[in-house]
Amino acid sequence: YYIQEPSAMAPASILPVEDGDVVLDICAAPGGKSTELAAKLHGTGFLISNDISNSRAKALLKNLELFGIGNMCVVSEAPNKLSTKFYQTFDKILIDAPCSGEGMFRKSQSMVTAWENNGVELFAGLQRGILNEVVKMLKPGGTMLYSTCTFSPEENEQSIEYLLSLDDTLELIEVPKYPGFCNGNPAWGKTENAELEKCARLWPHHIEGEGHFVALIHKKEAEQTQVFQSWIHRGCKPDKNAEEFFTHISADAGIKSAYIEENNGRLYYMAECMPDVSGLRMLRQGLFLGEIKKNRFE
């Protein structure tokens, strides 16, 4: 495991994930926020954790496996590829956006070096590219959370202004202001939209953590909501090897034999229902349990 920075715990705890939700963590590595989102699902719904970097996605997968999550899929794709596949699919989306990392300067010299080499303009552009695609994937009635670990208005208030300009059904909702949390600053936006006060800034001199920014955005319900994503439903009869394995598992573990699948001797615990991820760079669907070798389980 690794110890998550205190301020970095805020985004996943604030996003109001409910049982049965279909959730996307689009910039998920190394996985701390994804594990919190999965915990809030209580084994229901489905979580897609994505990171565009294949090497970072492997680290993400390792942490999700350690957490024992079965109702999940880890992919490594660009946002535009995901939006083509998952149009209006997700009830909740977490965007922990790549940023200049100003909030981490006192903790990490590497963040200072990255800022000197790239500046805020590069990251503001990356964020807008992600937001262009994420807005397409959120269901009407759904909620997304945008966060960064930087101070710059270009990557925070101004990125939220940009997001709101993409779709007139989007609206800011108030981020819970825990002790030490401050409002977003409308004066730092280009339009000075008073609604930006609903965002939250976490300043390191006010809290026992590093700098962070959090915004909650809701997409209003449409008159008619269509289901665009195709879903794969699991069958109810496990194969022979899975059946034998299940007989040795305590019922207290909460494992259902119908959700165990075998692939070349490897057993996986899968969700009852999951989105179709064909055509995507998928690292793992479900939880790897072990292998059947010479009539024994390893």
Please give the residue ranges for each predicted region.
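Conserved Class I S-adenosyl-L-methionine
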Residues: E157-G180
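Conserved beta-strand signature within the Rossmann-like core of class I S-adenosyl-L-methionine
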Residues: T143-T148
